[in-house]
Structures are given as structure tokens and as C-alpha cells.
Design a protein with these regions (language model features):
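Transmembrane beta-strands of outer-membrane beta-barrel pores
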Residues: 40-46, 78-84, 98, 114-120, ...
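Outer-membrane beta-barrel "beta-signal"
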Residues: 40, 160-192, 209-217, 337-376, ...
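Repeated loop/turn-to-beta-strand initiation elements of outer-membrane beta-barrel proteins
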Residues: 70-75, 104-108, 138-147, 174-179, ...
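Bacterial Sec-dependent N-terminal signal peptides
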Residues: 1-24
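Residues on the lipid-exposed face of transmembrane beta-strands in outer-membrane beta-barrel proteins
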Residues: 62-66, 94-100, 134-138, 166-170, ...
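Transmembrane beta-strand segments of Gram-negative outer membrane beta-barrel proteins
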Residues: 26-44, 74, 110, 198-218, ...
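Residues that define the transmembrane beta-barrel architecture of outer-membrane proteins
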Residues: 54-60, 86-92, 126-132, 160-164, ...
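Surface-exposed strand-loop-strand hairpins of Gram-negative outer-membrane beta-barrel proteins
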Residues: 42-62, 76-77, 213-240, 376-395
Length: 514
């Protein structure tokens, strides 16, 4: 074992010392004018199937849309129930759409979205759903909004609805280089020279969180537990992304999944804004306010939540900090209520430009974004015979160097009578040097996190997943990825063989060296 650790350490050190610095004016880049879209769909519920259901579920969606050409776009999106009695229903999917100018600032906008997810399984069955939308969009310089006719169909379940939906779209600019230029160092030799990267940089932060929810008030468990009082402390694993819009203010998105306290199945998704009320070289004091959705394993509620919090960042370096935080977690139209506290590891960076940083030295950060189909064979369940599961998965790989990378991934079931099952995992990967005409790489990965829902036997939710895989470069930044391994729950009976196949897009972001 010591020999293996020594070998890995040598690889890491070799990578750190093999960097050559280049002039930043020689680094070619690309600009994507993306959009973040929020939409709201009032979904009619199947009361002929279950008369006790509330008539309408309000579904909030957030979508990240990327232009393919001047009229076609693709992207990924999530939905969450925020009104009605389906709190805890979440989805993940991929989409393809068109936006075609009609006249002046008015556009025809239509898209098709496929994904997986769910809440109460008897209403969604496998979890697969289709969402088709068509309507008009008004394009302003700083935002867009529109109205659409929407068809939502959990086609193996009972939820099928036509409705008029609304959306708000916020533009976003993203600058990046080809992945072949990742993990290289650059110098800014002439600050006055005009080049592609002489643009404002974006400050952002990413955080892995470990939180504890202490339920209070009239918080209750789900119907399976006869809505007994919820008194157990909930242990949750979360991830948060922050984008600064000024020196002190930021927007953020944040999600959690339970791994202890209740049987797995509880999760949340929040959007919000925050401000650093005090900043120094060693400490940030901050306040945040978020709204979003939460549910699963608690009494049926609408799902809409509010979450104010305060905290402190204790800076270890210019890039890393230990973050401590506490808050108040409250359902807007329900009983779920809790005090929260926790800690996290936060990473700060300035990316995408050189104009607003004091840096003279820069480095390109390699990132892979993958959309996967994941298969889990002979999955153990608590309420039925073993089944084969199909999941739609979204993952991000962040290169530490040319060999090691960090992993963040989520997946939602769409086939296997387990709608509502999902996982969120993080981990470490090792990739080999490229071979066979420098197109093929081997990958060894170890990840763990929280998973559960729909009777999949993960007990309280902790899972680990070792895998071995291959990637093959198709063209420029695109590659095929395939892997196989095991998904195991240490506290439950889950022990399943896992096969993953997906398409990966690689890129390199420019960040200032601290």
C-alpha cells in the first residue's frame, strides 16, 4: 500500500513541476452567450386516480441553455415542486430547443425536454417524463421573458398535464479555451495589449457542505410513518456554487441530500443572494437569503421553502477557506421547520479574463462536463423484487493536474419502477496518459455520497462507487466515456453492478494564480 501511495505522490509532484509558462496573448478562446432560464408550470394532478390529491402542483424549473447556432440551443435542467402536495418531487433532464426571430424583439421559442425524477412513486412509476413547450419570447438586452403552452407527461405513471407556463431568462457570458490547452501556465507580459482574454474576470466560489438540520415546531414524518413528529437530527451532504455580481455581493445555487437521520429520500434545491458584510485577508462574514424547494420522507406539503443564514469563511489560503454557517429552514405553506448548522470547504477563483484582476500569472483549469446513461443491475429494494435501474446522470470533472481530477455527479432514475430515486456523489479520479494515437485514456475513480428514494435499499443513504473506465476523443473537445463498477451501501443492502455510457465535453477556463 505504501508503494502505491508513494507512486501517486511522485506522479502529483512531477505534474506540478512540469509546467511551462506561455504568453497569454497566444491562448485562443471561445465565447458562449448562454442563458439561465427559470420557468413555472402549473401541473394538473390526476384526481380521478386519487381524489385526495390537491388539484394543481406548481413546478419550478431552472435550465442552463447553450447555443448550438444562431437559432438552435441545447441544455440541461431541473424541476422541483413548490405548490400543491408534492413537495419532494425533483427531476433532472436534457433539452433541445429553437429560438427564431419573428419581428423586432419577439421570438418563437420551442423546446423538448426528457428526463427522470419523481416524488411519490405511485404517481410517476419509472420516473421518465417528457416536457414539450412552445410559445413566444420577448428579448430585452439584460433579460428575456415569455409564455408557452406546456405538455408534461410522466408517461409510465399518472401525471399528464397541459398548461400555460411562464419563464424568465437571464443571459450569461462564458469564455473558455480548448481542453488541449488545460493545465498550462501563462503570463500577462503586456497589460495594455489587446487580446481575447482582456475582459472582466468573474469571481466565483464552489463549496462542499456538511450540514445538520434540527427539526422544530410541527415538523412531521411522511404518511408511511403516520406523520409522526419529526425530531431526529438530519445529516445532509450539499454542494453550492456562488457567482459574484460585485465585490461583496453574490448569487448562488445550492442543493442537499440526506445521508443520516431518516431513510434516504429527502433533498432540497435553493437559489438565492448573499453579501459579505465584512471582508479581510483572513475572514469573510456573510449573510444569505435563499428560496427553493425541499421534501421527501416528510409530511406531504407544497415544497416551497425559505432559508436565511449567516456564516463566516476562515481563509486557509487565497483560494481555500473553511466555511461555518447556521440558519433557519422554513416551509412557506407547510409545517417543515428546522434550525441548521454546518461547515464546508470552499474554493474561490477568478476566471474568464484578465481585466479586473491584479494577477500577472494565470493557469488554465481543465473541466469535463458529461451527460450519461447509467445502468444499475439487480438493484436491491425494500418493497419489491430486485430491479434493473436506468438513470440520467450529469457530472463534472475538475482537473487537479493532468493525472488527478475531482468528481461531482448527480443522477435520477427514469426506468425501473423507481421514480424518485436519485444520488449525489463526489470523488477522486485518476486518468492515464493518452494512447492509441493519443485518443484513448483509462480512468480509475472512487466516489461516495448520498443516494436513496423509491424503496432502493440504501437505508439512510450513504453509498460508495468505485469504477474503471475508458474515454475516447471523438473531435476537438468531445469524447465518448464508458465505465463499469459497483455501487454499494455500507448501511443498507444495496450492492449492484454499475455501467455508465456518456458524451463528454472538455474545456479549459482561465484563472488567476494566487
Amino acid at each position: 500500500m505504501k508503494k502505491y501511495l508513494f507512486f501517486l505522490l511522485v506522479l502529483f509532484c512531477v505534474e506540478l513541476n512540469s509546467q511551462q509558462k506561455n504568453d497569454i496573448s497566444n491562448l485562443s478562446g471561445h465565447t458562449l452567450k448562454n442563458a439561465v432560464r427559470f420557468n413555472f408550470i402549473p401541473v394538473g394532478m390526476p384526481r380521478n386516480f386519487d381524489p385526495d390529491l390537491k388539484p394543481t402542483m406548481g413546478l419550478l424549473g431552472v435550465h442552463y441553455q447553450i447555443p448550438i447556432n444562431n437559432w438552435l440551443y441545447g441544455g440541461v435542467g431541473m424541476h422541483a415542486a413548490i405548490t400543491g402536495d408534492q413537495g419532494g418531487l425533483f427531476t433532472l433532464g436534457a433539452e433541445l430547443g429553437i429560438s427564431k426571430k419573428i419581428i423586432r424583439k419577439w421570438f418563437l421559442d420551442a423546446n423538448f425536454h426528457f428526463g427522470g425524477g419523481g416524488g411519490y412513486r405511485y404517481l410517476v412509476n419509472d420516473g421518465a417524463f417528457l416536457n414539450a413547450n412552445i410559445g413566444i419570447k420577448y428579448q430585452h438586452k439584460k433579460y428575456a421573458f415569455g409564455v408557452q403552452f406546456s405538455h408534461l407527461n410522466f408517461y409510465t405513471g399518472e401525471i399528464k398535464s397541459d398548461a400555460v407556463s411562464l419563464f424568465l431568462e437571464i443571459p450569461s457570458v462564458f469564455r473558455f479555451a480548448d481542453y488541449k490547452n488545460a493545465q498550462k501556465e501563462f503570463t500577462l507580459n503586456n497589460q495594455d495589449e489587446d487580446n481575447f482574454w482582456k475582459k472582466p474576470s468573474t469571481k466565483n466560489a464552489q463549496q462542499v457542505r456538511f450540514d445538520f438540520f434540527k427539526p422544530i415546531g410541527n415538523s412531521k414524518k411522511d404518511n408511511v410513518n403516520n406523520q409522526a413528529p419529526l425530531t431526529e437530527t438530519l445529516y445532509v451532504l450539499g454542494f453550492e456554487y456562488q457567482k459574484y455580481i460585485s465585490e461583496k455581493s453574490f448569487l448562488f445555487i445550492h442543493t442537499d441530500a440526506i445521508y443520516k437521520g431518516l431513510r434516504a429520500g429527502f433533498m432540497d434545491l435553493f437559489f438565492g443572494a448573499g453579501s459579505n458584510i465584512h471582508q479581510s485577508k483572513s475572514v469573510n462574514l456573510f449573510t444569505k437569503l435563499a428560496v427553493g424547494a425541499a421534501g421527501g420522507r416528510v409530511a406531504p406539503e407544497g415544497g416551497f421553502m425559505i432559508y436565511p443564514s449567516i456564516g463566516i469563511d476562515l481563509k486557509l489560503t487565497n483560494s481555500f477557506a473553511i466555511s461555518l454557517h447556521s440558519g433557519y429552514y422554513r416551509a412557506i405553506a407547510g409545517d417543515l421547520e428546522a434550525y441548521t448548522g454546518g461547515f464546508g470547504l470552499k474554493y474561490f477563483s477568478n476566471t474568464g479574463g484578465t481585466e479586473t484582476t491584479l494577477n500577472k500569472e494565470y493557469k488554465t483549469q481543465g473541466i469535463h462536463i458529461q451527460l450519461q446513461n447509467q445502468t444499475y443491475l439487480d438493484v436491491q429494494k425494500t418493497d419489491s423484487d430486485n430491479v434493473d435501474l436506468q438513470l440520467i446522470g450529469l457530472r463534472f470533472n475538475y482537473d487537479l493536474n493532468n493525472t488527478f481530477y475531482l468528481i461531482g455527479e448527480t443522477g435520477f432514475a427514469y426506468k425501473g419502477e423507481s421514480g424518485g430515486y436519485a444520488h449525489g456523489i463526489v470523488g477522486l479520479g485518476i486518468s492515464s496518459p493518452a494512447f492509441l494515437d493519443e485518443k484513448l485514456k483509462a480512468h480509475l475513480e472512487f466516489a461516495g455520497g448520498a443516494a436513496g428514494g423509491a424503496g432502493v435499499d440504501t437505508e439512510e443513504g450513504i453509498v460508495i462507487r468505485p469504477t474503471l473506465g475508458l474515454s475516447y476523443q471523438l473531435a476537438n473537445n468531445f469524447s465518448l466515456y464508458a465505465s463499469g463498477g459497483k455501487m454499494i451501501s455500507p448501511s443498507g443492502n444495496l450492492n449492484t453492478t454499475n455501467i455508465n455510457v456518456g458524451l463528454s465535453f472538455g474545456l479549459a477556463t482561465l484563472r488567476g494564480k494566487n
